[in-house]
Amino acid sequence: MSIPKQLPCMVRALYAWPGEREGDLKFTEGDLIECLSIGDGKWWIGRHINTNTQGIFPSNFVHCLDIPTVRPGSSMSRTSASSFRYSSPQKSSIDTPITSSDQGLTPDLVGSSNALNKPTRESDSLKHQKSHPMLNSLGSSLSLKKSVSRPPSSMSRTNLDVSSRWDNTADNDSQIDAQDLSRSTPSPLRSAMENVLQSLNAMGKKSFSRANSPLLRLTKSTTTSKETDFIPVPPAHGSTSMTSRSKLDDSTDNSSKPRTSLQPGESPMKSSRDISRKPSMASSVLSPSDYFPQHRRFQSAPAPIPRPVSTLIPLTQVRTTASNVIKPRPQTTERPSTAQSFRKGGGFLKKTFKKLLRRGSSKRKPSLQPTPPVSYPAHNVPQKGVRPASPHTLKSVKDDLKRTKTYTKAEFAAKREEIFNKLSMPVYEPLKDLSECIGNVLADGEPVQFSVGTNIHNMNFSAIDKQIRSIIPQRVQVSPAVLAKNYLAPGQTTALAQMRAVFIYISERITFTNQTLDNDELRTSTQVISEGQGTPFEVALLVKEMLQALDLWCEVIEGYLKSPDDIYYTRDININHAWNVVTFDNEVRLIDASFASPTHPQQALKSSSSNDFYFLMKPNECIFTHVPENPDQQFIMPDLSMPIVMALPWVSSVYFTLGLKLRKFNTSILHLNDLEVLQIEFLAPKDIECVAEVDALSALAPTADVSQCYKYTLTQAFWETPDIRVMRVKAVMPANNRAAVLRIYAGRLGVSSPVRTAPHPMAMSLPFVHHGKNKALEFVTRHPVPHCPSVDLYINSPQCGTLHSGVEYKFNVSAYACQPSTSISNTRLAIQTPTGNIVRLREERSGNGVIFFSLSLTINETGEYRALILAEKIGRWVVYATWQAV
């Protein structure tokens, strides 16, 4: 993108832009736009030269031209715009005004051979003006076609023969015989239209000279640097014939590389358009005219690419096989040039003109024979030249693919045995041991199953919470008993309501602090209330005194509060926390008002209210983070040993409220050897999405670069059965590190953020270590797809984020139905190359709510490769994953 030196200025469209909303300026590739204002820098304001419409447009879709311009109100500007307004869309590549590049390459389409001996263009123009006056016969179709195309100018070719000139159009329809036309009865509507066109022709001729028009200056400035001295020899007079309309329309689906010489069997006009076409346009498989009606830019696309290709890709760009990207088509025809042509979509009135002009002519001229399509050699196919991959690169690719492969059950068992023998460390399965416990302990000492009991989390306490939060805090010397009886208990008729009132008041009004008094003594409960802050031990004692004042049994439990960064085999276990135990419905429950406070540093929920999960917790849920000093205070039968309790992963309240459940978890997977990858699996409901990251800051020096300390993981969902949805997380150890922490965030679907961020609260934290050699590895980047909520996509391969040029990769993707009643038969997947080519993935097999797609693709371009899924609701391609090719 270039910045205009002065305003207004002329810019040329590099790509097609259909606009996103009202007020946008629509244009096609190659159009001229007069920039009136640069706006905010990214969106400019301009006027379309062809349509004379104004609007805003993206600045990276155009490039500035160093030519002077005129104001929209001038006569030159209006006449210039009107001179192109009546060009036929079907013949835009033929009827396009001839630019300086066309003159420099092919000065004559049809003419005598002595045309090359003319000294200058000025003398050529004067001679042409004297020898070829305008044809003004209304009864002749030749003059009408001439007026529709453009008025005569100094750029016209010398020795122009009228019949041969109009024999070279792209239209397959026959020329209108003037004699047959004169014998027929003229139509009044046709006569009126001819008069209008003739008047417009005369007006355009008087208003300005095309030799000094902005268009001519524009084309001279843009093509002089490339096409200055090369002038090919024109063919013999009358030897040029253009293809039929059907061939011309078919040619818009193909492209070729620009050529610098005239090929045998080609017309000079076609050769000039080949040379004037830009390489960036030739690299696309489809012409912009194919996808112009549906092309839009998706603003929330997180992954930028070198050229402005939309995140929402039109359907018409799709190729169903990879051969279209790598190999040329055996028979292709050249599409119309977009760099030097000014085309406008055909309207109803223009089509009516053409039908009336062709009326009365049923003959076809024998000289107009369709030209067979031109075959291009393989080296002219627009693809980026890449050398074959070296053996070292192939070995590196093989290692990355093997490293990211999913472990099987047998491999997990072998890994467990290897860790046990190599490191001489016991392997624990804490989740399995916890599930084998009978259950919670009742108040009378009898066990009860975990699933039995009142579910506190589904109860509504909004009325009690609102009443307690309306109480103005008293910063006076008041005892806990007076506060509970006179301020909190009134209006609370049940023991559950009274416990809830005490919990809300203390957790939201008492700020967490680790600082004790100067003499390391605990504050009294009265001091905690008056100061509004307290340590976990002081808060637990305050809860006990207030509940006992309300005749409710409560005791204090001291123990160790696990940190998200604690490794399971740590021996640094000190008493650092305290919480309370109560009885409810003849069942033991736990309350931690200090940890539920929004001011606690380990609080996962970043909100101003307390965390309700830590009100009346079950012992089997509390044991993950709260390790009591006395094993009897676990209130689980049988009691778990200290190593097993420490081996339990750190989980927050989000883990339980969202219904997550770890599986196949043991401590051996937290030890990585050489090039191994950490793999974690857990069950998750269908409306839950997860994000993971690896934090290596705790293992590095304080002066380490923070931007280089985070390596991201790969999180994907798949369905084992129509009812079991599994989230699989893979992570690697950052290079030059021996220890790190895997943090998993979870939340409800619908967050339109890149997966490489943490839009949800942390649900799990798993510290892990690495032994042996290590190698840097990045996974493929996944993006959320809110437009396709009924499909879960799982990338089987390649899961590495870096693709190497010259290597053939096999893309395997599985699509799962999120609901048994949802049909995913219409799922369409594709891969988009850095140059914008789209290759469809083939459906291999399907069944039981899953479809497997595959594609073998050789990486011949460097840049960003995108994985696309067709969103049926909006009819666009949406990006769900990206790779980087190097």
UniProtKB/Swiss-Prot annotation:
Its main location: other. GO terms for biological process: mitotic actomyosin contractile ring contraction; mitotic division septum assembly. The modification Phosphoserine is found at residue 213. GO terms for cellular component: cell cortex; cell cortex of cell tip; cell cortex of non-growing cell tip; cell division site; cell tip; cytoplasm; division septum; mitotic actomyosin contractile ring. Keywords: Cell cycle, Cell division, Phosphoprotein, SH3 domain. PROSITE patterns: SH3. It is found in: Cell tip. Residues 89-104, 155-188, 253-264 have a biased composition (Polar residues). Residues 72-189, 219-290, 358-393 are annotated as: Disordered. Residues 72-88, 135-154 have a biased composition (Low complexity). Residues 6-67 form the SH3 domain. Involved in cytokinesis. Belongs to the CYK3 family. This is cytokinesis protein 3. It comes from Schizosaccharomyces pombe (strain 972 / ATCC 24843). The lineage of its organism: Eukaryota, Fungi, Dikarya, Ascomycota, Taphrinomycotina. The gene is cyk3.
